[in-house]
Amino acid sequence: MSLPAGREATLLAFDYGEKRIGVAVGNSLTRRARPLVIVQNRSREYRFEAVGKLIAEWKPDALVVGLPFHPDGAPHEMTQLAKRFGNQLNGRFNLPVTWVDERYSSVEAKAEIRAGNGRADMLDAEAASIILQQYLDGLSDDHEFH
C-alpha cells in the first residue's frame, strides 16, 4: 500500500500467539510504535470481536503482522498460523496487511522489560510494538508501505 508523501497513517501491529495476541499502535509521521493491549486468543469469534473493536477505535490505514521464523530463517508451525491470522484480518476488515520477520522480537521485549522499559504483563504487546517499530524504521521518506 502506498500513501502520498507526508500523509499520516495509523497502523496496528499484531504478535500472534496461540494463547495471546499482542497489539501495538503506531503512526507513520512520528514513526513511533507503542504497546496497546493483549487480546486473549480464546476462540476465533472472541479474537476477531476484540480486534474489530480495536479497528473501530483506532481506524488504522494498514495492519502489520509478525511472522515467526526459526533463527536460521526457516518457517515453523507458528509461521503458518500467523500468516493465516493476517489473511483473516485482511479478509474480515478489508485492510492491507504487511508481514514483518519477528525473529527475536519476544527476546527483545523481555530485555526491554528487564531494563525497566515495559511491563511484564504486557510482554506480547511489547513484542508487537517492536515488530511495528521495525516496520516503521524501514519506511522510506515518501511513506511507501511494503
From Swiss-Prot:
GO-annotated biological processes: rRNA 5'-end processing
Give an example GO molecular function.
Answer: nuclease activity
Keywords recorded for this protein, A-Z: Cytoplasm, Hydrolase, Nuclease, Ribosome biogenesis
Q: Name one Pfam family in it.
A: RuvX
Enzyme Commission number(s) from the entry: 3.1.-.-
> Which enzyme type, at the first EC level?
hydrolase
Q: Which family does it belong to?
A: Belongs to the YqgF nuclease family.
* Function (record text): Could be a nuclease involved in processing of the 5'-end of pre-16S rRNA.
Q: What is this protein called?
A: Putative pre-16S rRNA nuclease
| Entry's localization field | Cytoplasm
Keyword Isomerase included in the entry's annotation: no
Q: Return the Gene3D superfamilies for the record.
A: YqgF/RNase H-like domain
Cellular-component GO terms for this entry: cytosol
Entry-linked SMART domains: YqgFc
Q: Which domain of life is it from?
A: Bacteria
